[in-house]
Amino acid sequence: MAPRKRFRLLELGSPTHSKRKVQKPLQEKTPNLRVSPLAFKIGKEIKNKEIRKTKKTESENIFNSKHVDLRLESPHPGLNFVSDAQQYSKAGDVRYLKNKSSNTLKNERQTIERPSFDNSLRFEDIEQPPKSTSTPVLSQSSQINVEREAPMFPVPYYIAPSPMYNFSPYQNFVGNPTFLTPSHNPNLNYAIPIQRPELLYPNVNVYDSPLFKKTRLPHQTKSLDKEKNYQYLPIYPVSISNNGDFVGQETPRAAPKLSKKRLSNTLDVNCSDYESSGQNATYNDSESSLN
């Protein structure tokens, strides 16, 4: 009878890791069948020894060890500007090449010297121009123009962009940006205080400016003094005058109307009372008796 096929699970390293059972690859048959089992066993032992040896050397290699000490990368003790030929011939510290326990490493770490710096160094020692007889005296080492490095941190003040080349409709010719609401102005890299709309319309009461629209609240429509109970809503977008020249939309856009079914009392918005005259935009309420 043929021997029963033995099955094993697929190994983790294989490309498709699944629970599917795969046939074990057939072992190579020994060509000489008359070899005594003892000799075969000895050969196997030798092979295992070799494998163990290679494993050991691999573990001694620093990059395979558990605790990699990166100080091995630089065998020199510290920053030495003057190159010392003998210094580079020194071998790396052998203590760290063996795979040691973290405890021993920790103890040894404290015995390592701190990097030594060469204080006797002068500027002339670092860069000397090649001395030749043809070089005039003026361009000797004392006259070398060394470029300054760029500063690490930005200067402590902002250099604001000039409004002349920076013009956008939201800035007047003088260069003062006018904001009706706090907004992000990509042209400016400095902060500007929020301006209230009443400051932009100096001649008029703020609620008479075309920025706001009277709207009655639904629960107030049936009250006795209808005129006094209204809510001020801002109208967007707001047109901004640029020195009397209107930019964008002249007639202020009305807030969206409420459906007549819900609010039968609401008047249609009539914008004819708004007069747009640059900075001095006014609102003439023809219906009110207060004028």
Swiss-Prot record:
Residues 116-125 have a biased composition (Basic and acidic residues). A motif (Nuclear localization signal) lies at residues 3-6. Residues 130-143 have a biased composition (Polar residues). Residues 1-30, 116-143, 271-291 are annotated as: Disordered. One of its GO terms (cellular component) is condensed chromosome, centromeric region. It is found in: Nucleus. Keywords: Meiosis, Nucleus, Sporulation. One of its GO terms (biological process) is meiotic sister chromatid cohesion. It comes from the Eukaryota. Required for meiosis I segmentation. Probably acts as a regulator of kinetochore function during meiosis I: required both for mono-orientation of kinetochores on sister chromosomes and protection of centromeric cohesin from separase-mediated cleavage. This is Meiosis-specific protein SPO13. It comes from Saccharomyces cerevisiae (strain ATCC 204508 / S288c).
